[in-house]
């Protein structure tokens, strides 16, 4: 169990990374929003879920690709921009901002030889849009299931199959359905880099974005957070879970 003061110190480092990322996005007019547990924390706690040990963000794929190009030149020396290209041992398909002032060992990494950068982190995922049809919903669900079967590393099942080339091809097949952001009747979907979440969202309930309070700062969020969170979570997210479910991903956190 991570001691509360250690976890809080890690959360404040992540908050600093989010503030820096937000400033870069404002400078370059890039869109992003709080996602998953970070959005839930903003709605329910006006900050981190008390036991959360990461930050989740999403970006329209066009903005995500621009950020990929400028990140190395824009980020401060406190942050490592982690991709499978900047860190050859990193086998995940999305990007992370990693703190150079800390280290986190997640439970799935415990007792394994890890060679990639392990600073506390911010996850960033690319988002797409598709036409709102039953055929597209079936295609999306089927594609994510195929990606899951090729994602033992990213889904923390080391005895399973890991096939980066298959994942890449499947994610690219999703991008071929991308329709842009100008029609509120479309659905927003994850780009396949987070295949354990198969939610899709009404574009009109996400854009335009609105600011939401998080740790006494304000950051972009879907304009209807309730719609977004209900699409992700199959439980009443407004209620605190039982104490035995209030667990971190981390086995240990340390600082340099």
Where is each model-derived feature located?
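Short aromatic-enriched loop/helix-cap "lid" or pocket-rim segments at secondary-structure transitions
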Residues: 45-46, 135-138
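Short amphipathic alpha-helical patches
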Residues: 48-49, 63, 148, 252-256
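Conserved catalytic core of two-metal-ion nucleotidyltransferases
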Residues: 2-26, 71-132, 151-232, 238-256
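Short, surface-exposed, charged loop/turn segments at secondary-structure junctions
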Residues: 137-151
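Active-site nucleotide-donor binding segment shared across nucleotidyl transfer reactions
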Residues: 22-55, 59, 64, 232
């Amino acid at each position: 169990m991570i001691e509360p003061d250690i976890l809080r110190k890690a959360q404040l480092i992540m908050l600093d990374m989010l503030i820096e990322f937000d400033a870069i996005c404002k400078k370059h007019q890039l869109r992003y929003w709080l996602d998953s547990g970070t959005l839930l924390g903003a709605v329910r706690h006006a900050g981190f879920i008390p036991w959360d040990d990461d930050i989740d963000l999403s970006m329209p794929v066009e903005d995500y690709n621009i950020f990929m190009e400028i990140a190395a030149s824009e980020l401060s020396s406190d942050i490592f921009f982690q991709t499978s290209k900047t860190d050859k041992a990193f086998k995940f398909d999305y990007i992370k901002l990693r703190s150079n002032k800390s280290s986190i060992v997640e439970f799935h990494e415990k007792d394994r030889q890890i060679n990639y950068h392990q600073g506390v982190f911010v996850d960033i995922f690319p988002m797409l849009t598709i036409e709102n049809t039953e055929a597209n919903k079936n295609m999306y669900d089927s594609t994510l299931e195929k990606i899951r079967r090729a994602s033992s590393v990213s889904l923390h099942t080391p005895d399973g199959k890991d096939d980066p080339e298959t994942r890449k091809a499947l994610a690219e097949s999703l991008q071929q359905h991308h329709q842009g952001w100008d029609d509120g009747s479309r659905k927003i979907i994850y780009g396949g880099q987070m295949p354990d979440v198969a939610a899709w969202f009404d574009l009109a309930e996400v854009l335009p974005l609105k600011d939401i309070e998080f740790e006494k700062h304000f950051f972009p969020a879907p304009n209807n957070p309730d719609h977004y969170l209900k699409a992700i979570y199959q439980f009443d997210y407004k209620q605190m879970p039982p104490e035995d479910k209030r667990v971190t991903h981390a086995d240990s956190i340390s600082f340099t």
